[in-house]
C-alpha cells in the first residue's frame, strides 16, 4: 500500500469537487485531496505507530486543510458548510 494518492483516484476526486472543467485549484478540490491524503496517512499510522516522520507530515496536511477551511469560512460561508457536510468533517 502506497501512502500517496494515485493519479486515477486524484482525477476522480477532482472531477467530483471541481466547480468547472479543469478546476484543480479551488479550495473545495484542495480540501478534498488533502482529506483523502489525511485519511490514508491516518490508516498508515494505525499500523506503524512509531513512524514519527509520517506523523509530522500528517500534522502539516491537517494544518494546511485547516487554513483552507478557515479561508473558505471567512469568504464564502455557504461553500464552507457544503464542503464540511460533503466530506463529513467535524467542526
From Swiss-Prot:
Q: Tell me a GO cellular component.
A: cytosolic small ribosomal subunit
- Domain of life here? Bacteria
For whether the record's keyword set contains Ribosomal protein, the answer is: yes
Q: Name one GO biological process term.
A: translation
Give the matching Pfam families.
Ribosomal_S15
Q: What InterPro entries is this protein classified in?
A: Ribosomal_uS15 (IPR000589), Ribosomal_uS15_bac-type (IPR005290), uS15_NS1_RNA-bd_sf (IPR009068)
Q: Which UniProt keywords apply?
A: Ribonucleoprotein, Ribosomal protein, RNA-binding, rRNA-binding
Single GO MF descriptor: structural constituent of ribosome
The record ties this protein, via PROSITE patterns, to:
RIBOSOMAL_S15 (PS00362)
- What exactly does this protein do? One of the primary rRNA binding proteins, it binds directly to 16S rRNA where it helps nucleate assembly of the platform of the 30S subunit by binding and bridging several RNA helices of the 16S rRNA.
Family the entry assigns: Belongs to the universal ribosomal protein uS15 family.
PANTHER family documented for this protein: RIBOSOMAL PROTEIN S15, BACTERIAL AND ORGANELLAR, SMALL RIBOSOMAL SUBUNIT PROTEIN US15M
Instruction: Summarize subunit and interaction data from the UniProt record for this chain.
Output: Part of the 30S ribosomal subunit. Forms a bridge to the 50S subunit in the 70S ribosome, contacting the 23S rRNA.
The UniProt entry, under HAMAP family, shows:
Ribosomal_uS15_B
Q: What is this protein called?
A: Small ribosomal subunit protein uS15
Q: Where does this protein come from, organism-wise?
A: Nocardioides sp. (strain ATCC BAA-499 / JS614)
Amino acid at each position: 500500500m502506497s501512502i500517496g494518492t494515485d493519479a486515477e483516484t486524484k482525477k476522480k476526486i477532482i472531477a467530483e469537487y471541481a466547480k468547472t472543467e479543469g478546476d484543480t485549484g479551488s479550495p473545495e478540490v484542495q480540501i478534498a485531496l488533502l482529506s483523502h491524503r489525511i485519511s490514508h496517512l491516518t490508516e498508515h499510522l494505525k499500523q506503524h505507530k512509531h513512524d514519527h516522520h509520517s506523523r509530522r507530515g500528517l500534522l502539516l496536511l491537517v494544518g494546511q486543510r485547516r487554513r483552507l477551511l478557515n479561508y473558505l469560512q471567512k469568504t464564502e460561508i455557504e461553500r464552507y458548510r457544503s464542503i464540511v457536510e460533503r466530506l463529513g468533517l467535524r467542526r
